[in-house]
């Protein structure tokens, strides 16, 4: 994914695109905080609430929490692509 760089956010490992947060490891190390459009977030949560969820803190923001213990590894590339599209400037989306 063009422009993605390793970084940190709130003291945890993160990925950013052009300085904009794409995802980060949650403080507890058991989940990731992933940028996600609201509509898609609701679909993920409705389809698998054990894997995808939010807390009150994230309710008004375009983020979803993803349980690393529950998520299917083959789902990660698609999730990263959705997050990348949500975070990256339109010009950078050549994937």
Say what each PLM segment does:
Residues 1-95:
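Charge-dense, helix-prone N-terminal extensions
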